[in-house]
Amino acid sequence: MERKVTRRAFVQAAALSGLAAAAKPDWRARDFSAAGEKTAGNQGLTQFVEIFIGTGGHGHTDPGATVPFGMVQLSPDTWTGGWDHCSGYHHDDTSILGFSHTHLSGTGAADLLDVLLMPGTGPAHIDPGTPENPAGSYRSSFSHSQERAEPGYYSVFLKDYGIHAELTATARVGMHRYTFPADPASHFVIDLAHGIIDPPQRMHTNVISSEIRIVGSDTVTGGRRVKEWAPGRYIFFAMRFSKAFTAAEIFAESKPLGPSVREAQGTSLKCVVNCPTAKDEVIHVKVGISSVSVEGAMKNLEAEVPGWDFEAVHRAANEAWELELAKITIETSRLDHKKIFYTAFYHALVAPTLFSDVDGQYRGMDLEIHRLPAGAKNYTTYSLWDTYRALHPMYTLVQTERLPDMLNAMILMAEQSPAGVPVWPLQAVETGCMIGYHSAPVLAEACVKKIPAVDYAKVYPLWRKRAMVDDYRGLGYYRRLGFIPCDLEDEAVSKTLEYAYDDWAVAHLARAAGAHEEYQQLLDRSRNYKNVFDPSITFMRGRFADRSWASPFDPRGMGHSKKWRDFTESNSWQATFLNQHDLYEYMKLFGGEKGFVEKLDTLFNQSSELPPDAPPDIAGMVGQYAHGNEPSHHIAYLYAYAGVPHKTQARVRMLLEAMYHNDPDGLAGNEDCGQMSAWYIMSALGFYAVDPVSGNYVFGSPLFDRATIALANGKTLVIQAQENAPDQPYVQSVTWDGKPYTKSWFSHAQIAQGGTILMRMGAQPNESFGAAAEDRPPSFG
């Protein structure tokens, strides 16, 4: 049976439990300064990162300690049930369960939260309790006024125990520092049953198997296999304490196994280790993790944190973040803009996550153990339906040293996975979440931009199979009929449109491989979007197998019936502008440029009302434009193709100001592994990739007075906005290295050479800039 492929299942489960889409307080009315307080000595760019942005509302981010693209995300968990706890943490909560070592950043589906550790004093409890009923549990209350976070560091005071907890991390190791009060019964709880509880009423995660072993008097090792969103994934750990414990006991199904039992297997395992403490005594704990084995976790631990110097690990984590954040420097008089930008940059560098051990071993998508060539790294956590749009284009500018490994990891997945090419891979398991197969545009973009050290010869045969052979989620109908019938397949309109874009991407891979006939076939097929466009109403619309149009039709609705949704986390208003690659042909369907622009204007000026069954993913509304979900992200830039880029400039500047704020509820929707932030980064710099596969960017409205991007080839790109101001969003003129530049777009090849783009801004639009046909962005070329 096919697993549900969208995030809607998680949203619906949360709604049933009363935990989703509840009204939230106004964060801007709260004192956020204490949560954003920085540690002494943090004076670089990391001081501008407000990690709590996105931890409230529907942002779904966590505030914990990690390094760029780290395997470990060591963070507090406040609750693990309900849609708004996909990351394990929500800023509304007032108690902490403990600190687990893996987290998803901003997703709308939930998993991970592996290897929970919680310190305590007094009698040990092994029940996690609930936010509503914490009595007799190991959780503790806390206050945001006693909580701090910065890149690579988190701290909180656990009020119920009088313990100060601090966290930092390397790539594969989480390091804890706990300052205890005097107590002969101080202890730690290790909970291998902790994790996402879906549905929330179940009260424990779905563990297939787990094992735990007490080694000597200072080490605990183990692992588990979990059946949640990524069913059947493995995680192993090696945990070492700086102080020998005086006693240790394993619990199975909440029952103590006795002090003589040193190891156990089961589906609900916990362990309590006792460490009596004096006043202000510090105990360190370091935890290595691995998808391969306990031995792999121990190797990671010993290689990355051989000693007990917490501050050295903290400094190294901070320096790693400084190195990455320094790739883009900005000048602006508005501190909030600077904080939002560097927080967005931070969030954009969390995933994909490292997925190979220090010895090069990793678990493949066939669940077997493989070894990489020396120096190579493997990655996981690819939210491709989201991130192909802006995050991966951003990486081609600022992550070119990691990008080959990230791309080669996807090729390995396609070779090893029984599910074929990656869709939403997580820790060696294909979740199958969301539609399309948008690893294709990521690899096609890299091929077009000539990203080196990638084995492109392997790519086309693997992705060709999905495009030309696989009977995958309606692709058989799509190939035979040119569209997917909405009475035979759920979300048929969105699937048709996204397969058309994937065809466009695979066509580029075919051309690179010399498969010229199939290149043309795929190119032609990428115009299948026409087959779900109803010219009588100028909307994308569901179509039955007999080719008749689905009724009833409401462009705000999710589909033509409660049984059959026609759109994926969107409606017809948003799907009607999903076209990214064939804009000039597409405009003809609206009667030309004028009709297309009028339709775009109407989208933004419509009522924002949605039907009751609309998922909360459709958020951040401006008319029927939904910035809180990815299908809308390129839409404001489409005006440039119709010769009116000044409308793009006005819309983009408005979205930059309205959809991002310096507070916990500061995102318009899910962060989605960096995509929501990448839109902000690219747009604030002044350009965006409407069609990433083309290798081109469209000008928007730069937010900063000056931005400098350090390119990997040693060159720099400077974007300077002259006479920039909140009421001056319009581009009056552009010069490139001092020469007049009249186009509303540029290519990746151009900016890869560096240079200075000077944009003179004004309060009134210059309607001649970018208006001429020869100055508009290319499309389908």
Each language-model region and where it sits:
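ATP-dependent phospho-/nucleotidyl transfer catalytic cores
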Residues: 502
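Hydrophobic membrane-targeting alpha-helices
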Residues: 22-26
